[in-house]
């Protein structure tokens, strides 16, 4: 039921604006709307009940463990939200003169510098508003680099078969042909295939490290040498940066460009369709092409660098400089944790993943890459269980909902049949992981004794069986008062 369906004519609710200061309305009369906005007329009690019921129908990191692989569903500290919503930040207009926003510009400059240090890059731009847009920026800069050097014959981007789907989509959007290379049985990129794929047409290699298989590419330095020797550049998909914070820098691995998902590694809110942010870092060779604006600090004053300062820039990717509120939350997060805290993130994320992997292995679950240490996530394959009982990975995932846990990522990466990609972020306690293990044991016992019951799951959700295809293909997000 939508909030609009609770609406009744002339039903009222009190405005709950802050009472600490008088309300200001500086909107000129000629810009004020003349008609009444189409808003629901609902009492305070009905409003509270409506949104409380909705929250009870959804899983969230605020209520339970959320081991969604390759998504890093860590807790978002409330302090980050509170500080980012200070009136001084919220009332700042992006077109205000630079001298009136020195505090905000200082925060953005420091965030750029912190991300440079974390990644080992020469410079960072904060303008990108999503991970996929960060990829687009990175590959566009690689293209600009080759074109600036007259190397227009480079028409191919090499991508491992374990990559996120956005990688090949980005390469195609930038006009490149995708060359897919296989993964070997240990989970690493097949080096012979890489050597065979590189050549005068190679524009670059897109790589996630650790990969979506949950393992660190052991020969990443050699891969860098091979691609660079062929004249190509290396793109780092920062989806799994959480696993290596403070331990190794993408710049030290030889990468030329990186995007960082702030909603993963730097604890900004997930979901809801945004707002998002994915800062992009570059090595020296790509520095001229960074998108603008970028914050500079010169003679004690912060200012925007624009196209006039960076004539070779690929341009602007957002109306101003990205999603300011999200960037502020990330800045506050890294300042709260400090350097030591950033080191501990990767340590605890890796510890949690390996502990959970070991406990599930003891129960009899098959680990996809049993000879490798989990970097921050790992894969359980249920192929043998499905062949023996007919119970699929999706069945188990839906049964986990009945146990009070969000399901892991299912059927990704595509290389592993009947897979569950499980990522316990660093913020989860051992007690939480043990409860999850106990739930997995219960389901394993149910598969042995009541497989049909598991196949029919979930049983206790407000909505049980959803048409996944229709939900994805036929979105209906606009309320129509006429029905």
Swiss-Prot record:
GO molecular function, one term: pyridoxal phosphate binding
GO CC annotations, alphabetized: cytosol; glycine cleavage complex
UniProt KW Oxidoreductase keyword: yes
Cofactor(s) recorded in Swiss-Prot or TrEMBL: pyridoxal 5'-phosphate
Taxonomy, superkingdom: Bacteria
Ranges in coiled-coil conformation: none
EC main group: oxidoreductase
Keyword terms: Oxidoreductase, Pyridoxal phosphate
Keyword check for Oxidoreductase: yes
UniProt-listed Pfam families: Aminotran_5, GcvP2_C
EC annotation from Swiss-Prot or TrEMBL: 1.4.4.2
Protein task: The glycine cleavage system catalyzes the degradation of glycine. The P protein binds the alpha-amino group of glycine through its pyridoxal phosphate cofactor; CO(2) is released and the remaining methylamine moiety is then transferred to the lipoamide cofactor of the H protein.
PANTHER family: GLYCINE DEHYDROGENASE (DECARBOXYLATING), MITOCHONDRIAL, GLYCINE DEHYDROGENASE, DECARBOXYLATING
Family designation: Belongs to the GcvP family. C-terminal subunit subfamily.
Protein known as: Probable glycine dehydrogenase (decarboxylating) subunit 2
Provenance organism: Nitrosomonas europaea (strain ATCC 19718 / CIP 103999 / KCTC 2705 / NBRC 14298)
